[in-house]
Amino acid sequence: MLTILTILTSFIFSQNDCTDGRYIEEIFNVDVQYGIEYGENINQNILGSDFTQTLFMDIYSPENDDFEDRPLIFFMYGGSFISGSKSSPDIVALCTKYAQRGYVAVAIDYRLSPVLIFNANEEVAYKAVLKAMHDVKAAIRYFRMMDESSPGTYKIDSNRIFTGGVSAGAIAAVNAGYLDQYEEIPAFLLDDYDELGGIEGLSGNIGFDSSFHGIV
């Protein structure tokens, strides 16, 4: 069952020994892997023309940490779905703080919808949220794919995956968590879902599980 967590550590405490300060205190230096490709999909530029966008993420990990099963948390930036970046200062700060506490924190790029600047109707807005939802699901699937094909690469626990974000990113994270069954999709959104790839989307790593366990 999906949970909205205001204090993530309350969930983690029940899973692990935290007597060394892990998950509470900033006890680690941070290693960052920049520009890891996790997928690609069709997007539109500001004029509405299609192009293929490659999707990247930055992975923040506790440095010199030998723990094998670390919680994984994704942060999505804000910007009204028309601007923003995984290198936004607030996202960098969040990822750094969580990695210092022992999490693997990930800042993802997701497809923006600059066409909203000139055409902010409901259909375009719904599609903007849906594209971001599909992209974070692809990023989650990437880690499960790597966990299966190259165990220990990122030292994550695939049973403790969380999402969160700022502003538009928070909206995308919540929707990715709660619109996860086809029968739950409002009738007026069905055509958009079908056009863009259904619940899972087409952003990459299809066939792996995209579920997660809480929203921060």
Predicted regions and their residues:
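Primarily recognizes the serine-hydrolase "nucleophile elbow" in alpha/beta-hydrolase
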Residues: 138-216
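Bacterial Sec-dependent N-terminal signal peptides
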Residues: 1-20
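Cap/lid segment of the alpha/beta-hydrolase catalytic domain
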Residues: 80-90, 109-130
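Short amphipathic alpha-helix adjacent to the substrate-entry channel of hydrolases
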Residues: 87-107
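N-terminal cap/lid segment of alpha/beta-hydrolase-fold proteins
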Residues: 15-68
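Short beta-strand element of the alpha/beta-hydrolase
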Residues: 68-79
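Extracellular/periplasmic catalytic domains that process cell-envelope and extracellular macromolecules
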Residues: 27-29, 49-52, 66-68, 98-100, ...
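Amphipathic alpha-helical segments in well-structured domains
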Residues: 91-95, 129, 133-136
